[in-house]
From Swiss-Prot:
Bias (Polar residues) ranges: 1-19
Chief site of localization: nucleus
GO biological process: negative regulation of gluconeogenesis; proteasome-mediated ubiquitin-dependent protein catabolic process; traversing start control point of mitotic cell cycle
Sequence similarity: Belongs to the GID8 family.
UniProt lineage: Eukaryota, Fungi, Dikarya, Ascomycota, Saccharomycotina
PANTHER family: RAN BINDING PROTEIN 9-RELATED
UniProt name for this protein: GID complex subunit 8
Presence of keyword Transport: no
Amino acid sequence: MTISTLSNETTKSGSCSGQGKNGGKDFTYGKKCFTKEEWKEQVAKYSAMGELYANKTIHYPLKIQPNSSGGSQDEGFATIQTTPIEPTLPRLLLNYFVSMAYEDSSIRMAKELGFIRNNKDIAVFNDLYKIKERFHIKHLIKLGRINEAMEEINSIFGLEVLEETFNATGSYTGRTDRQQQQQQQQFDIDGDLHFKLLLLNLIEMIRSHHQQENITKDSNDFILNLIQYSQNKLAIKASSSVKKMQELELAMTLLLFPLSDSADSGSIKLPKSLQNLYSISLRSKIADLVNEKLLKFIHPRIQFEISNNNSKFPDLLNSDKKIITQNFTVYNNNLVNGSNGTKITHISSDQPINEKMSSNEVTAAANSVWLNQRDGNVGTGSAATTFHNLENKNYWNQTSELLSSSNGKEKGLEFNNYYSSEFPYEPRLTQIMKLWCWCENQLHHNQIGVPRVEN
């Protein structure tokens, strides 16, 4: 196995790295070969240093193992027992399955971790996390059966769960006016999911009408019914916000562009912004938003049950914080300097990840890219852009531009700060994957080599 690495140390031969013309270190790409056993040792070494895997026993060299008097014992090795900690990866997977409402996978993983032992536990587990109900609601939305989904939500949770009002105080105290304004803008986009479902239902009604073979026969009646639906269900909500009114107007524009076969050369091509409204991925996006809102609704009850010892299950929605707040000090020395001489700010190990990412202007701007669950719809000039962003969840194409523009030059790109208390219900595994991508983008931006396996 040959690994391409960035060497920042001088070697005797100077073939991989050496002194630069000015006597400084020459940062060049070198190659180092590992056998499978050596590579496994390297992986195990850094995994242990970062404490990413928790074992029941830890082997300490006796020469560094402290004794009761504070000194150290003779050389050799000894094993001490430690408190068993739940394996990281299975816990992450269980958090993902429960959050995404995958019933079978959740039950299997919970059985492997020992949380479920019999059929009674399965029933209690499902009732606590509402996995079946949330999956059914998501499924209905993805099929375009929006009325059925809203009836299901109303019967189980109540529609008011989708109409959460923005609170500028409470959890928002201590934030600057700018932060509260950004949070208000984000709420305007993602807050009223009841309106989004009603609007999506309007789109599905128009889609269904256009797919009929003979649409001219009942066209007038359909338009009258559609206008009545908009007045009764959407008008009041839309009148409270310019953005909502723009979204409603854009959806109503679909009536002017009937669906037509691509083979028909005389047909009018549907504009891109309207194509996005018909996109199936828009259903999935809204289904995921609804699922997160339902998780936020049931989580306090779950915490109450656990705090009062009424539940044998742990809080699987709020994963072990050690997963996100690991001590990464051992890795930082390798990221001190980029090959272009750029100094990378040292990351303190006693901060949570979201604070680490905001330690300087460059990382603060990129932080909003990987942590922000929404697509930076703030400041969009039209409803078309809003719906386009709803459909396309593109986190990474703008990273380089953000990193460049934030280095002392403001280009007017605004992204909301991420507050862990606001949107904690995205699966932790997804957050870690975003963190991984963010780190790779940072390494690439600072011209730091990443090990790669070559054939």
